[in-house]
């Protein structure tokens, strides 16, 4: 530190910035404060926006236009104000250019925070970019045809380069190489992207120091040799790198690599030694100083964390000379993973256990991909047919990556889903890891002390690791979470003996509900396997997410058993999902009236369909009226899950509940309100029998059915039940331990 004054200063500045960010929040970070658009307008309000285009993307149904320097006019309150950045979605094929000023008439919409634990936080993602709202445009007019020639030319060149790669290599491999070379992931095959991520090689899709080394250091060294001048080489490399960075965009990893490149070249030009820790600290100060929200960004933490591992931990591993060959090969990769594990688990909830070995193949071949990709593209742009052959090398390597990823997922324990650790566990982990680094760095190298060093380090690391991952393992009691999945139903039950259950899972207004809402929630809770998935009936808003989960078991969550109502209540959709479950290795079980499923003190009992005393069940058809009804008991806690039951089905259920209440003197703490709060369900007679303390309603915001219905809400209020709705609360959860229970937001 005494020989690195700039490093010391940067660390102090980082500590100050971090403290201000954590304590000051919106007082210190302007991006967290409401923007004029949020203050002056409301959701779906009509406005007229006039702004300058700084970026645009072509979508299947129109264009996505990024505007800056915006003037916004609210039509309803006749108010005009300024907004720094806005995104416009419009179904128009009109040719636009960067720098054009356009006027758009449309409706305002705001980004949402994550509605469930583990879900993508769209609002925070755009806040980091200084964007607080979007406009769905109906009319558009170009008011100024001025063009930012420099950025427009780069955008056209980038788009043309991407088209060339896709044309020459095909959509799958071409899309991957476009992501690697250009940072363009919007049209990349989602399955390919996910395959890389779950295998621990998603980092190759991020523009990093390796890319800038080829673009910048390659040119720098070439021109330095040609001219014999460090300054000329540095200037040429810097100019080429500036063009490349301007084309791909200044992401946080690009910013880090750009600053470190300047330090590298600057050290050569001035005849000084390049110091990676100092360059890294300066890059961190610039990044956090320009946008403090990077401190909460997974990309920032992974990018800088990987370089921090290279500076601190990996040198300690390499300096031990008397090591087995396998340790020397795998040691650096394992050491880096040890540094990054808390970040990986916090943002992705799982660790690919074979990633170290896979990266031994992937990383050495990356220079080949970059050099052949850039060279082949340039030759092909110049009209040379040899460019196609050069690009074929990249295609073969990417197919090798693909095959290895698919193969490794078939290996036992390929992925370890540990869940999202609490922040305090991450802090303790890093404090103990720092202790290990100090032990290795400063303990004397006498043989006896070396053995003590190994033992102390191992004991300390095992303790740190157990603290990091033990959250889900130490969970006590039972927890029930009603997920917000829009217009649909999905409830997760985590039992006292660590078995996991899902009751329904589907939505009629949210696409890919299994992949983007249910699965991330399960993984964030450390749920790698669902022991039982109950399907109440065959409506798609209760089952399409379950179908996704069944198909995604290789990269998602395993499902042991699918539980369906008795055969007499099956329809075509239930038959279809049963066939699908068997095809993907999931057992199928029927649950008839009176069937019980126990886990310790917790018990599920099926109360329908088919439980009436007058044998009316023969008149009940498939569908809502024959929904599976479940009674959950845990100690003195009782909860009723009613699916979409209504009409005759609810009448029969009321008769059953009357008998149970008289025999067992049961009161239900929570009722999962049937059919999303439809007026045809949850009658006064039914509520007089159940008399719940709390009523949970799962319904989509602004749904076309008007759920929950006002009459249903009035009946619930009249019964004395306190209402929790996913529309208002997002995910809702209840935790039960012994004789205590508390309801809280699912994100808490």
Regions from the language model: what does each represent?
Residues 73-74, 92-107, 124-126, 131, ...:
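Non-globular, low-confidence helical/coil segments that flank catalytic cores
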Residues 1-21:
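Start-transfer (signal-anchor) and selected internal transmembrane alpha helices
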